[in-house]
Amino acid sequence: MKRQSLETIHLDKIVGGGQALGTLADGRKCFVWGGLPGETVTVRITKKKSHLVEAVVEEVISPSPDRIQPRDPDSYLSTSPWQIMPLEVEQTYKAQLIDDAFALHNVTLPAAIDIYCDNVAYGYRNKVEFSWYSESVVSRAVSQKKSGLVSGPELFSDNNQDIDADSDREESSGDTLDLAFFRRGSKGKIVIDGTSLAHPAINNLARAIRNLLRHKRVAARQLKTLLVRCDQSGSCVWQLYVKDRLPEIITATEAAKLPAQGGEIIYSDPRSPASRITERLALFGNTTLTDAILGIPFRYACEGFFQVNIPVYEKALRDMKEWVSRESSYWQLEHHQKIIRDPRKVAQIFSEVLLAADRPTLDLYAGVGTIGLTIGSGNVTLVEINADAVREMQRNITELDRTDAHAVLAPSEQALDYITGREIVIVDPPRAGLHTDVIATLLQQLPPRIIYLSCNPVTQARDVALLQQNYHIVHHRGYNFFPRTPHIEHLIILDKKP
């Protein structure tokens, strides 16, 4: 049996990844999940490096006054590690992390950080991917428990090396399966019945599929994941990813009885851990969902990209729209009049503002078009690298009869000719931030305004630090798209310097 590595440490602060930070006796930094600043805790080391370690809390010796009981005590570390703090405390930490990110890159934000939240902390997710856990492993653990080898919460713990949720040789084709999440910091799994983050319809459908498969004598080693998605009304679609070609594991009659509008069985190459589509084995019902964003309907596939917290996303879009509209252009004129004394310069800016009100819009990293097609101008170009997303985008453009919208299938860094300096540019990049070629072209062509929505304030701050040579920040705001998690969205409006 592998020996556990336990340490008792004091936690000092929350850091960018969402962990609490402490220091081991040997001076190495310890990044801890499940802890809060000010606490003294015993942690289990999950990863060791020469200059740092990662760990999870095993015991809280001296709790923070902010600590609360997590809604999902067994699985919260896997999905939403900030369930241990009140929502208002979470808001404070998220503002702090944004501030820290920009301070790291010597970027001064012009106002105090405001984090918008609609105060819906649970039940907001419209998409969840579940893993599987074979009942035969649990049966083996139960027999050990009866003999005194395993007890209490250790039943599904990584502490017992004889219980390996990932070991195919421990599984059999028994009658029972369980839904599961991967345990943070290990390869083990945690048996679940659902997650409090999800829309209730998602949990209900996942349990229904689990209950159906329990009678199929199928082992977890034959399955990869279950992806469930719902629209705002609670109508669901599902995709069952399998490692063996099992097209009849769910029949059409059985699928029709599930609480879903449609679903698919998908063979996914077992050589890859990711749930990628290798072959579509069976299709049931209608697997395309439709949701309205700011009153505009969008179609999207179960596996496609779409926002998981639509109400908060819509608030971000409304805020962004103000900076595409004529009203925000006049705000820009008023702002410059206060700082520029030369009347000829003011007249030039006034002329530019009138033109800006009717400028085209360029939406980079556009996804299925939910930004450009809702808040973009009458002339909008949308650039996206994912072919499936572009197909959905083009379908949305056609159904909306948007003859003034143009979809481009390309990486943003290979669509630089669309940055001409005339358009308002909207960017919503992945966590890696803007490609260096995109930044270089923006600095060369100098569009009048850049609207930058980011899911990673650290890379956003890095990019803004480079853009600041020709741009200044006129507005910023944070958004809590993912309550109970460390993830943050942050909006920056950059205007070209006069």
Kindly give the residue locations of the regions a language model identified.
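Terminal RNA-binding accessory module
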Residues: 1-74, 174
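Rossmann-like S-adenosyl-L-methionine
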Residues: 2-10, 16, 155, 215, ...
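Extended interfacial segments that mediate partner engagement and assembly in macromolecular machines
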Residues: 58-71, 76-138, 145, 169-220
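Short, solvent-exposed loop/turn elements at beta->coil junctions and helix N-caps
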Residues: 113-120, 225-229, 478-481
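Short hydrophobic transmembrane-like helices used for membrane targeting/insertion
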Residues: 137-138, 142, 150, 163, ...
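Intrinsically disordered, low-complexity segments enriched in serine/proline and basic residues
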Residues: 140-157, 161-163, 168-173, 332
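Internal alpha/beta scaffold segment
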Residues: 188-224, 230-231, 244-265, 271
